[in-house]
Amino acid sequence: GRPWEQIRLAVAYPKLNVKIVATHCGISVGEDGASHQALEDMALMRALPNMVVISPADAHETYAATLAIAEYDGPCYMRLGRSDVPVILPEDVSFTIGKASVLRSGKDVTLIGTGQMVDACLEAAKMLEGQGISAEVINMSTIKPLDSETVLGSVKRTRCCVTAEEHSIIGGLGSAVADLVASEDPVPVMMVGTRDTFGESGAPADLMKKYGLTADDIVKAAKDAVSKKPRRWWRR
């Protein structure tokens, strides 16, 4: 729309030192419905040259990311939701633009989450562990520039991955990871996110379940990814 065009021409094109913080992003906005649920914002901002795109995992990382983008000389977009998000990172967590963090090591599948889906990835990893699958969890708080080194290093070990985002799978984290992996080290990539759809009004937890954005959905995707690995990689 018109605001995006203004950001494109008046901020990204001249590479101005402007910081944009968006709230009420994702399906968990809840009762406000489709008109208020931004499910394509990361795709729109990621497509803009010069634009940094941030999606922090919790309150502590949001604070650290705010300090980091304030020091960065250039346009930045930071994405926040509306609903309460569990605190999963320490209060003194560090934040570097373009750097992901491995929250849990594993050898069978890589789970890459952003925003509040990082917590769901950690929960899914525990569930998978009980089923004999070792999952590595990556907090990808910077969508652009993507931390290609961390992603490729992880999938080199696990040989498959799942991305999880409270956003459309078109143009967001999943697309970014799939683009990278397809060109550098092709492995199965499964995406957890909304599917070419608008949202609707409802309780946040109910909407997360309906649109397939829960730990159970990540577990299912992880099993699917593992099943698609070449057999020589499974349980090496």
What are these regions (language model features)?
Residues G1-T110, A135, V226:
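Conserved thiamine diphosphate
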Residues V29-G30, R79-R236:
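Thiamine diphosphate
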